[in-house]
């Protein structure tokens, strides 16, 4: 198996290194990741300047761009072969519910999915890298399952509780939950007395009932959510056609 690995925390992130170490024994891996933390960059591509590719002493490639840039350049400019799978992570912090729209971790996987390649995004619930070896072991378990019964070009979002491997409950299929709207921005002043703003924290859980990613991970399960690119609101499509008729 040939696997492309990326992330949004940067090429030096412990989660990326742990994921690469876990998958190297079972696959030929290529790692292409941002040069720095690009959390929250979503699916953005850098179009206003050229990008540069560097290679670290451990063989990892790193790019002064977004996670989507990294996967795009890896597939169209660096790799001499087409990978069988793209994995992203392991992210420091959850990517559940509305988080998936902003997540650079999910975006890296999505970019590969857009190229017709199966992709999986891996995230830990809590920041701080606690139980990272456990999360990496879960990632390897999931990659080895192959998911032959899924459509050929699947896109999965995996969230892993920060628990010892032996304490984790079995992985379950989930849907995305929902959050309340984000908290207000945090206003401050720079050294020159000018107003500056920090984006506020994410909103709390709004839809976290049974069957959601929020609920599953709260019970100690690994959550696996199948994602899709089509954002069409099909329930409103027929009504809109009537309005426009």
Swiss-Prot record:
Cofactors required: a divalent metal cation
Keyword Metal-binding: yes
Family: Belongs to the SurE nucleotidase family.
Enzyme Commission designation: 3.1.3.5
Protein name: 5'-nucleotidase SurE
UniProt-annotated location(s): Cytoplasm
Coiled-coil annotated residue ranges, if any: none
């Amino acid at each position: 198996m040939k696997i492309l690995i990326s992330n949004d925390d940067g090429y030096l992130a412990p989660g990326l290194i742990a994921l690469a170490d876990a998958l190297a024994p079972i696959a030929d891996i290529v790692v292409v990741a941002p040069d720095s933390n690009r959390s929250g960059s979503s699916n953005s591509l850098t179009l206003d300047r050229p990008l540069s590719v560097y290679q670290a002493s451990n063989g990892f490639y790193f790019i002064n761009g977004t996670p989507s840039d990294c996967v795009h350049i890896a597939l169209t400019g660096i790799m001499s072969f087409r990978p069988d799978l793209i994995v992203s992570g392991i992210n420091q912090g959850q990517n559940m519910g509305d988080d998936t729209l902003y997540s650079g971790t999910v975006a890296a996987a999505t970019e590969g999915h857009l190229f017709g390649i199966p992709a999986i995004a891996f995230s830990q619930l809590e920041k701080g890298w606690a139980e990272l070896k456990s999360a990496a072991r879960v990632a390897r378990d999931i990659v080895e399952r192959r998911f032959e019964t899924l459509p050929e070009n699947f896109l999965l979002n995996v969230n892993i509780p920060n628990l010892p491997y032996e304490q984790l409950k079995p992985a379950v299929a989930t849907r995305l939950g929902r959050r309340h709207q984000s908290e207000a921005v945090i206003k401050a002043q720079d050294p020159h007395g000018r107003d500056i703003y920090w984006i506020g924290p994410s909103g709390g859980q709004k839809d976290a009932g049974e069957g959601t990613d929020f609920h599953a991970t709260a019970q100690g399960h690994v959550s696996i959510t199948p994602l899709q690119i089509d954002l069409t609101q099909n329930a409103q499509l027929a009504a809109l056609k009537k309005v426009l008729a």
